[in-house]
Structures are given as structure tokens and as C-alpha cells.
């Protein structure tokens, strides 16, 4: 019988569904089906909103399962809310030198934000069982709300859509690593 590495239980299922949605969204993006891609990004964000809450309901998780959950969540977040939005924004018009620099800035800050979160969350879970109340910096998942809103506005913005997209990606990427406290939404 074949066995697989990793942990496969209900605590990570929404994380994997989120990843599936984002991979589908990337494929929609490269085929020019932007409405479907944006929908996939929003669905991925919705899954990510609840994955931690579901994981915390399993009270008998081992330390390895908890650590795996932190790591797999961040790895999936980098694909879902890092790489996927970069591909989508590039395809929607951020193709010049300024756009490419902004997208690289966004991606770099996404990685830094997730790495910092992993270190802090691992330490926090060793010290307390309490649910986190605040994030340091804007969570990377926020792009699943911001980018669809900017996309919906493209019919209104028309000639200014590219500017709005550039500004949104730069501001959101910067807020990932800005030392601000962001209240965690209650699910």
C-alpha cells in the first residue's frame, strides 16, 4: 500500500480547497477568463478566512500537526495570495517597468510577511492557547478582497483602471510589512 507524507484530515481541507481555487484561477488568468479568475481569488480568500477556525476545533492535534498547519497554510497563502494576484495583475495590465517593480515588491513583501508570521505564530502557540486578536501588518489574504473590488471598478474607472491597479498592489504590498496592528475579523 502507498503512503503519503503530510497530514490529511479535516483541519487542512479548506487550505487545500483554497489552493485548488487559486490554481484554477491562475489557469483562468492565462486563458484570459478574468471574471472567473477573480471569482476564484475571492473563493480562495473565503476558504482561508475559516481554515484556522476549523483547525482549532480539533483539540487533540499533536505539536507536529499544529506546526504542519502553520507551514502549509503559509505555503498555500503564498501561492493563493502572492503568486496568483501577481499573475492576475500582470495579465490585467501591469506590464511595464513600473508595474513589474511593483509586482516584485508585492511578492517580496508577501514572502517576508508570511515568514515573519510563521516565526511569531509558532512562538505564540508555544506560549498560549488563546486565539490571536491582532495581526502585525496587513494579512496577505486581504488581496482577496482588494483585487476583486478594483476589478469590479474597472468598468467605472476605464482609463484609470491601470493606475488604480498599480496603486492597489503597491499599497497592499507595503502594508504587508508595515508595523501596524490589524484587528483580526471575527469569523
Positions of PLM-derived features:
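Lipid-exposed faces of alpha-helical membrane segments in multi-pass integral membrane proteins
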Residues: 14-20, 40-43, 79-82, 101-108, ...
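Cytosolic, membrane-interface loops and tails of multi-pass inner-membrane proteins
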Residues: 1, 50-67, 117-133
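C-terminal membrane-associated helical module and adjoining short loops/tails
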Residues: 2, 125-187
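Membrane-water interface of alpha-helical transmembrane segments
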Residues: 1, 5-15, 31, 35, ...
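Transmembrane alpha-helical segments that form the membrane-embedded catalytic/substrate-channel core
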Residues: 48, 107-120, 170-185
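Multi-pass membrane catalytic core of lipid/isoprenoid biosynthesis enzymes
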Residues: 11-16, 57-114
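Topogenic membrane-insertion module of multi-pass membrane proteins
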Residues: 1-52, 175-187
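Helix-coil boundary and interhelical linker segments in multi-pass alpha-helical membrane proteins
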Residues: 24-39, 79, 83-104, 149-165
